[in-house]
A protein has these predicted regions:
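Short, acidic/polar
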Residues: 46-59, 143-156, 202-212, 296-305
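Aromatic- and glycine-enriched glycan-recognition loops and surfaces
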Residues: 45-59, 83-107, 145-148
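Aromatic-rich peripheral "rim/lid" segments of glycoside hydrolase catalytic domains that contact
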Residues: 296-298, 305, 309-376
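Boundary/entry segment of secreted carbohydrate-active catalytic domains
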Residues: 25-60
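Glycoside hydrolase catalytic-domain groove-lining segments
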Residues: 92-95, 99-101, 107-108, 115, ...
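Active-site neighborhood of glycoside hydrolase catalytic domains
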Residues: 177-199
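Substrate-binding cleft and catalytic face of glycoside hydrolase catalytic domains
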Residues: 64-80, 95-175, 323
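The substrate-binding groove and active-site-proximal loops of carbohydrate-active enzymes
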Residues: 43-45, 81-95, 133-145, 168-177, ...
């Protein structure tokens, strides 16, 4: 009888210790687990509001993650100062909008990766990968300014239990020249944020040269790899072209013993979608042939080539818009959207541009995503 009581007390004590460890050691234990092993992600486009049906649409697609992107502002690519744009941004890019969106998503079982970007004003054709200071003093100033800016979002993510943070995106020159400064930034982030960290390296040259992957939880790639050189490629040609990229990605994953996230991946609904996937629709010729079928094939080849690779943690598809109105089906939404686009073009006195999108939500590619994102 005494032995039984002693054993019972011991079991109770052990249970309390284990429960205490769960509470203190991992403050994220109450989070909803993904339905599938992969990160079924979408790059969320912030707007002036969010409605419940916006999140329902994501759930219906089978997505389990969204990324949210607030911005910091530089006045030219050699400016050592970064401005927090919290009060001069779309509501969804402000702190309040980010927090509200993440909370609404979490109610439906959707996790969030916070992915702040730098926007360069007066860029003169330069972008984030071209950021370069003109002296050591200015480099120190830039990294100090960047650290202050990114720590703002690290604290916001921690305070609101946002599950992942992308510490930077496509800073090619800075990552090659100053990896130690990036390690310092990462160490400072770790002091205030306990979730997972990644960095979004550009597909061209950068992802293979970043040397601080071992300080992060995942390798992140902005995966706009060129696949073919011709319009309207076959799916077989697209799958074949993924071969060389798969080999380099797998090699990198094995080198650092880290899984890889495509922090962005997407294709436009054009015949040349697989030639230069990174090209913005606004930069295309107005006569660029539209091809929803090519976009759909690009996504089919992407999933068939990579989704079952053990080194792949998941995709964040560029990009997904909120809508102010709830429509019964896509055709109704598309009809209304085309009507509004014609009205806007008429008011501006300009011809309506072709309906070229990155987002698969407007095209047949949506069903490809749904098929793969809802498959166990």
């Amino acid at each position: 009888m005494v032995s039984f009581r002693i054993c019972s007390v011991a079991i109770v004590i052990i249970s309390i210790v284990i429960m205490s460890f769960d509470i203190v050691g991992d403050k994220y234990t109450d989070r909803v687990e993904s339905k599938t092993p992969k990160m079924n992600g979408l790059c969320w486009v912030a707007g002036d509001s969010i409605a419940e049906h916006n999140i329902d649409d994501i759930v219906d697609l089978g997505a389990t993650w969204i990324s949210q992107t607030p911005f910091g502002l530089m006045n030219g690519h050699t400016d050592p100062n970064i401005e927090l744009m919290n009060e001069r941004a779309w509501w969804g890019e402000t702190d309040k909008g980010i927090i509200y969106t993440a909370r609404e998503a979490k109610k439906k079982g959707i996790k969030t990766m916070l992915k702040p970007h730098i926007w360069i004003r007066n860029s003169k054709g330069k972008w984030r990968s071209d950021i370069a200071m003109e002296s050591n003093e200015e480099w120190d100033q830039w990294f100090e300014s960047y650290k202050k800016w990114i720590l703002h979002y690290a604290r916001l993510a921690e305070q609101n239990q946002i599950e992942a943070l992308c510490i930077g995106t496509e800073f090619d020159i800075t990552t090659r020249r100053h990896p130690d400064k990036w390690r310092t930034v990462i160490a400072e982030i770790r002091k205030v944020y306990k979730g997972d960290l990644t960095y979004g390296a550009n597909w061209y040259r950068e992802y293979e040269t970043v040397s601080f992957w071992d300080d992060l939880d995942f390798i992140g790639v902005q995966a706009y790899f060129p696949l073919v050189k011709e319009n309207v490629p076959s799916k077989a040609a697209l799958i074949k072209s993924w071969g060389k990229h798969k080999r380099s990605l797998k090699k990198l994953s094995e080198k650092y013993d880290k899984k890889i996230i495509f922090t962005e991946i997407g294709y436009k609904n054009t015949e040349d979608a697989a030639i230069e996937p990174w090209t913005w629709p606004q930069n295309l010729d107005g006569n660029t042939p539209i091809s929803d079928a090519t976009q759909m094939l690009c996504y089919e080849a992407l999933f068939e080539s990579l989704w079952h690779e053990s080194w792949l943690e998941g995709f964040f598809i560029w990009k997904w818009f909120h809508t102010s109105y709830k429509y019964e089906d896509f055709d109704e939404y598309h009809t209304e959207r085309q009507k509004r686009r014609k009205e806007w073009a008429k008011k501006r006195g300009r011809p309506m541009r072709p309906s070229i999108y990155f987002s698969p939500q407007y095209t047949d590619a949506r069903e490809v995503l749904k098929k793969w994102y809802t498959t166990e």
